[in-house]
Structure formats: C-alpha cells, structure tokens
Amino acid sequence: MMKDYYTWTYPDIPEDVAQKLQQLKNSLVVVGIVGRSKCDQANKMQAFGMEPPIEHTAKDGQVQCYYKPGTSSLLLHFETTYDEAILGQMIDVCMEDVDTPFDFDSFYERMRCRFVRMMLLALHACHIVVYVETGPTFDPTLVTVFQLLKFAREQHLMQFLPQMLRETPAARMSEKTRLCAPRILFLFENFPRDEPKTRECVSAYEFQTEDCIYELLRHHTIVTNSSSTSLVALPNNKQFVFFNAHEQLHEDKLLKAIECLNQAMYKPDAKEEEEDLEILELAPFDGFVKPYNLPVDEKELEKQQYKKDHTVWHFLQRHVQDALLGCFDEGSFKQHSQHGQFQLLNIQEWHDYMATLHKLLVENAKDPNHETSNEEYKLFLKCFDESLNYEKKFWTHLCELGLKKGIAAYKNAAPANYGSATHRQLLADATVAFEEEGRGPQAKAALAKLAAICQKYWQDGRQQCEQLSLRSHPCTLPKNLPHEKHNSAVIHISSCNCGRTQGRREDPFSMRQANYEFYEHIAQMCNLCVKVKHYKFPVFEPSVSDYRAAAFEAAFPLLHTAKSGARQGEEGDDEPEDEVVQEQQQPVEEQRQNTASNGCSQPLSPTFGSDLNMSIAGFGASLNESQASSEQLSNSEQNTSSSGTSSADTENELVVELQEPAKKETREDAGPADALPTSTTEYLPGLVHTVSNFGLLPLFPSWSLACVGPSSIYSHNTGLQEHFQSGFLSGANFLLPWDVQLRLVHAPKQQHHTHHQQQHPGKKQQRWKKQGDRLSLKIFVGMEYECSRGHRFMMCAPDRVLRGGADIERDTCSKVVHNNMPLYYPCPCRSQTSYLAQLMRIHVVTPKAPVNIIVDPKVCVGKEKYTFTLGSIVPPRLSQSAYWIIRLPYIYQGDDVIIAPPEKLEPDDPLAGGYLLPGMFGVAETDATQDLNEPGRMGASAAEDFTRI
C-alpha cells in the first residue's frame, strides 16, 4: 500500500522532500507531536494516519519528521521519556547497574528533566504543539511540567540564547528566540467507555475538558494575555481539545481480522413486503439477493458524516489555517504588539534554526566535556537538571528545618555529662522532633547527619566514662577528666560481716572493693565486728615487690588448671598396686557404698529427729578429695562394721569414731603435715574454686567466718532481734532447728587404751558415760538473703521465703541443707521494681556438746560452672555453743572473668544464676589441742576425723 506521506529521521531530510518543502517558501507551519505512547515504536502519529518505518527504533531525544504532499504543515514527532518504550529502556539500564541500588526519586527526576529538555526544543522550533495523552483524562502533573518549562526558559534560555543565536546562521531568530508563542493542542486517544459516543456527548466532554485545562493554565500563569510573557497559547474561539471517540487506535490486528470475518459471514434479514413473498419463493435458497446491510436513515447518515469529519487531521488543519492567515496571535491573546512574535520561515531558515537549537539544548548536554566561553550557557549545561528538581529542594528545606529542631531538642535536654543509654534516649527524642518537620527522600541522610552531630556533641567533653561496675552499672564520671576511682552513682545497702550494722556502699568496680574493702570499712563503724573472733583464711604473702597475677589461657581457663591439678595428683599417687587390686576385689555392695561415700555422706532423712547411720567422710588433704582418703574411708567403714557395733537398732545412726587424743607437745612439733607449698610471686586473680591451682592464693579473703557470740543470744521464740541483726523482713528472721542423732564409737585400734581409761575415768569421760554412747545435737541454721535495698530474709526451702514461725515444720531444715539453694532469689519486698536478693550469709548456732561442727560451703556459679570454696585446705571447725556467721562473697570471679548477677530470674530455672551445693556441714570430735582460728596449725588428721552431715 502506497503511503501518501514522507517520513525521515531528523536531520536526514531526503532531497526530493527538501525540494517540495522549498516550494512552500514562507508558508511552512511546523507542528510538534509530544506526549505519551504505549507501542514499541513510541508512535503517537497513528491518530494522524501515519507511522514510522518498520525498521524504526525509538530513542530518547530522537525526532521523526512527517510531511504530506499538498499541505503546508511539517510534523515533528518527538520521542521522549514519556513514551513507554523509552521509559522501559531507561529502567533496563538502571537494572543492569547492580552496584547502584535503584532509587525511584532520582530516576523520576532524571526522566522528567529529559522530557523538559525535549519540550523546550519543541516550544521553540514549532508553531503548534500537540500533546498526546493515552488516557481519557487530563494529567494534572502536566501543569508542573509547564511551570518547569517557563522557569527554564526565563531563568536559563533567555540568558544565553539570544547572544548565541547571533553567532549562527539562525541570527534572524536572535531577538525573539522562538517562532511564536506556540499554540498548545491536546489529543486524547481514548474516550471514556461509560459515555455515549454521540456528537453531543463528545462535544460536551471536549468543552468540559477545555474549561478545566484553561483554568489550570491561567491559574498558574502558563497562559497570559501577552504573547511575550506566555509560555504557550490557547485559541480563544477554536477547539483545542480533541477526543478520539470513533477510531480504535493501537488495536489488536488478530482481533480485527476475526471481527471482519464475522461481519462478512453474517447477512441480516431485510424487511420484506407481503407482495414480495411470491418473488422470494422463486429464490433457490434463503437469503438469495438480500442486501448485506440494513437501509440507512438520515440520522445514521448524519452520524457517519460526523465520524468522517471528526478527525485529528481536520482538527489540526483549522489551526494551521490560522497560522497561514497571520491571525495566530490575534486569536490567542488579548494584548499583542504591532510586531508580534509569530513568524513563518522557509525550510532552509527553519532547518538552520532547528540545527542550532538541537545542538544547544540536546547534543551539547550529552557531552560532559563540552567547552564554552559563555558563562550562562555553561551554568545551564551544569545545573539545568539540578535547578528543575524543585521537590528535592523542598524536601531538603524541610529536612533542614527538622534537623535544626532535632539538634535543639537534643542539646536542650542534654545534661552536663551522660552515658550511652541517655545519649540513645536523647537521640530518639531528637529523631521524633526531626520527624515533625523533616520528610522526603533526604530524611534518611538527614537522620544520619543528626546522629553524627549529636554524637560529636556528646563526645565533646560530655561523655561519661561508662566503665561497667561489677554489677553492670556504668561509671558516671566524665571520660575526658582523670579520676582515680570509678563511680556509677548507684548506692546499695549492705550489712557488715556480723550482720549487725547496715551501711551505704558504692557500686563496686573491683573485686577488692566488693568483697574486702567495704566490709573492712564498715567493720570500723560496727561495735560488734571489732570484738568478734574471725577465722583467718589463707591469703597471698609476697616475697618480692614485683609480684603479679597468675596468667591463664583465655579460651580454656578451666582446662589449663585442671591439667595442672591432674599432674599434681599423679605425682602424689604413690599407692602400691596390691592395694588397688585389693580394692577391685571388694564385694560389689561394698564398692557401691564406697562410691556413695567418696567425699560426701548420705543425706539425712527428712523425718525430724531421726537417727542416721552416716559413714565417715574424710575431706582429704586438698580440695579435690584424693583417692587415698577415699580408700581410708572404705577401710574405716569395714573396721566399723567388723567391730560388731552395728545392729538392727542402730542402722539409722550417725557414727562418729573417737580417736585417742595425742599429746599437745607432739602435735605442736608435728605442724601442718599436709601443708602444700604456695607461690610467693604470683597470686590468684579470682576466687578459689575446685579446679584452681593449689599453689596460688588470693590477695585478700572474699569470705568471712566470725563467731558473733554465744548460742544464748538467739531465742527461737523471738527470732533475730533488730538490735542484733538489722534489716530483716517481718517473719523472716528465724533460724531453722535441725536435730542430728550421733552414736559415738571408739576406734578399734584404741579399744585397749580406752578400756584402760575406763578404769581411771576423767570428769569429761564420766559425763559421756552418763549420757551413753548416743548423742542428740540441736543445730540452728539460717540461709540469709539480702537485696540491694538492705532487705534481709531467711528461706525455709529452695523456693519459699520464711514467713514466720508457722512455716517451720519438722523437716524444714532438711529442705535447706540437703538441697541446692539458689544464689539469687526475688526479694519479697513491695516495690515497683523487682529486686534480686543474693545469698549473703549462713547462720549457724552450734550445740552445747563435745563435738565441733565443720563447715565447707561450695557455691556453683557461671556458665562454666565454677565451684567456689573457702580456700582452706582444712575446713573450719566451729566452737561449741556459739553463734557463727559465714559471709559469702558479694561478687564471684573465675580465673579471668567476672560472673555478673543475672538481671532477672527465669521462673522455670531459679538455679540458673548459681546455687549453694548441699552437704556443707560436718561433725567431728572436739580436740582441745587445736586452735580453731589458726587453720595452719591444724594437722591432716583434722581434715579426716569428722563426718559429713
């Protein structure tokens, strides 16, 4: 099919077309086609009955020219970023750049700037501009584009274009810089589907849209009364909006072919008259010689004529005629000068002018290395895109306001010195203040800037030291100022070693401050602490001035010390092999008994006051009970059972063997037989635990063991009085009674000597005989917990706080001494904040009997499950008929790690923070020759001759 028009890509105009255009002389009207399209070739000319060549490829900034011979109009088809084909190309390029994330805001700004650049070219190179819209409604964002076009023309183009046009073949256009105030027309390719497509409805819809567009353009001064100040022109008495209501554009060719086939096959019946029925009977078949269509009436003819006349081409030619007749400005503006802006050029003049504009506005902008002497034009090339991004300027302005508000909110609320937690809270408040004003794409960068400014302000002499205390509280002193001691401004209430005096203590930052210095300081203010007898724990005694802390492997501290302990055990293991063989040949039942009694005895029966048959448990010469002590224990059990003292009546008795007392002089000469050598150059940095090196001692004692008075100072009827033990909660100030039944048995090898003593008995042995070989002990025990507010209370079970005397039952104490007692427990005090109380003291009231109570508490703490001990090779003996208090460490430390208390306890696992192991009490025969306050003067026999309760 021959086309009745020519098409080419600018600037490659064919010679034959150029000759035909030359014949028009100064009657050439240039029409620009811009807007939106949906087809692959970005074609907006289909409504004009034109299309590009099949091999045509759409490109951004490309101009396709169309000319129909016999007319005076040259149509320029501008391919812009508003065409879907070109928009898709831009998106593909952005997606290929995997290093840069896709930013919609910057992409939209870049797309709009390119469209504005092409629109500037169209408004200066054309007399008429047709804006094509694929939808049935006007896009209000086009008003924003017109505003940007007016800004760009007045602020940029008019600054350099007149001067630069004088230096080109288009010098004729240097004064006016454009052909005219171009008349803007609007083409809507689709009509609303729900509206009837009659002449009246289409015209009414076109008039309604014209009124809307006119009001918008007049309101934003896009169209004015003067052609010199107006960006575009609108005709006063002519239609400038066209709706394509009858022709389907961009239709599916397959569906069109199917529809044509259906119409060809369908023949509707015509209305036959009665007289024609005889003629129709002669027809060879039905439908013979019947017309294909119904007869058309006058209304149908009028409708078809309207469809024929209502075309885009006729719509455009009415405005082209205004341009040819020279009444272009008169038909658009009320005010116009005698020498109006409108002018017609021949093809050569227009081509020179178009080439200059295209180079200045499009080509040079694509070359970042373009050099020019015109400063205004240089500014245009450099800042054109940035100057059009008014949204970015708007969002930037809002973010600046929000930034000022956020900074002011931060600085006004900031104290003189504050820590990171306060800084984060102030920054959060500043962010809220910022968000009251700051919005848009720049908000994220502005928030980062706000955080940086606030961070710098905080670190500029206002930052706290924030060294964490052992209770996980930060130091509040200024970081940039030197300070000898840290201070977290957190005050705790704690009691002294004896529990009589309570005082305020600062949050500790060192183990020495936590476990030693505070108690030494408050002891000076306590009337009781300075009088009581204290057990002396072994501590490090340096022999050089440059002593240091022992080094441990950071990753495996327990493994290192365990290996060293194992090596020492191997070196000290010199038992003959025949003893090992003899042990293996023991009956199975006896081996089970030995295993059960290896270092710990059987627990007491929960029945109050019952007799128990407990085996003698030697603690050994070290904290890791050696195999030798275990074998000695087995031998002693065999001797006990073979002596014939066991019977059916005494199976549940606690057996204590009475040893023959040695001479005092002999024991003093012997000294500590099993004393281990200790280091005098390296000390243990933490607390003593079960796998720590035996030769390392701590710098200071973290435990305290003191006798605060005789047993008579405690009355079970009134409990602990406030003048003696202050700070106890009501009803939680009672100790738990514990009855233990003993059976005294003489050692087999001393029976002859004992028989000799019976013939010449002393007073002490005479009192024993009067009491028989059984002895009932009444011990009072209390597990005291203390919270940071100074509240103290006893517990009657691992999960129950003592509420008064009614909570004390027959087996209450057994629940405490024979179960794991939690190291931390919620304080029952009434407070909005839940405080954790810590096991701080163990109260023991010893009986008035010829035996000593042995204490050996072990506390299991931490993820590595350190088991901390008193650190004494020989467990302490408590004197008879006395009130003893064991004060536990305030803070626990392993080899190289501080074990901080938990923030809260899980209800299903109260022992997660740590616990006191059961079996800490033992009983042994009283030995008057031993000094209970001097552990170094106690022999190895003291560690062996007692029974664990």
UniProtKB/Swiss-Prot annotation:
Basic residues composition-biased segments: 749-768
Acidic residues bias spans: 571-581
Keywords of this entry: Nonsense-mediated mRNA decay
Region (Disordered): 564-607, 624-652, 748-768
Residue ranges with Low complexity bias: 624-648
Origin superkingdom: Eukaryota
Biased composition (Polar residues): 594-607
Record flagged with keyword Ubl conjugation: no
Biological process (GO), any one: nuclear-transcribed mRNA catabolic process, nonsense-mediated decay
Reported function: Involved in nonsense-mediated decay (NMD) of mRNAs containing premature stop codons. Probable component of kinase complex containing nonC and recruited to stalled ribosomes.
Family the UniProt entry places it in: Belongs to the SMG8 family.
Name recorded for this polypeptide: Nonsense-mediated mRNA decay factor SMG8
Organism (species): Drosophila erecta
Lineage: Eukaryota, Metazoa, Ecdysozoa, Arthropoda, Hexapoda
